[in-house]
Amino acid sequence: MSFFTTNATDRGPGRITGNPMNGLCERVVIQAQKVFDACIRQTQEEGITLALTGFNPENPVYPLTFLSARSTTNQGTVTNIKIDRLPDRQRFARVQATVTVPMEVVYTDANGVQGTAQSSVAIDQDIIMYIPEPSIIPFTVDAVVSIVAPEGIYVEGPTFTVTCCITMIMK
């Protein structure tokens, strides 16, 4: 289906009449990202500590009651990456990294006022991946992450301990 509605010009979709190269003066570069391998991991983690910052509204009255928490973006920040090629398996490597995911926590304070705060979760990954041969253009390792914490308990100060469901795709 075409969304081209003006048929008055010869530079539009449709049958080619005459020289198809007539009028072509633009060059277009299309860049695509090649994915060599991906690893999906789905887990339930208990005892994850969320240290809260950036309260809205500010200065809540403690103790806080946990309502929910979830990741604010699906892109994890990959740090502390270490790639060790496997000598017995060509183009495979052990990939170790820390993936940090920003979180938004919803709570009520001691006065019953609902608020939100920011936190983050750092997850250590240790996986085997297919990686390309060394080249001039380096490859990257990315993480797509979703974290949902349906339950948690107040510890002290601005801190919760939560149980969360994590889905992570390393590619």
Give the location of each predicted region.
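Viral structural modules
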Residues: 1-171
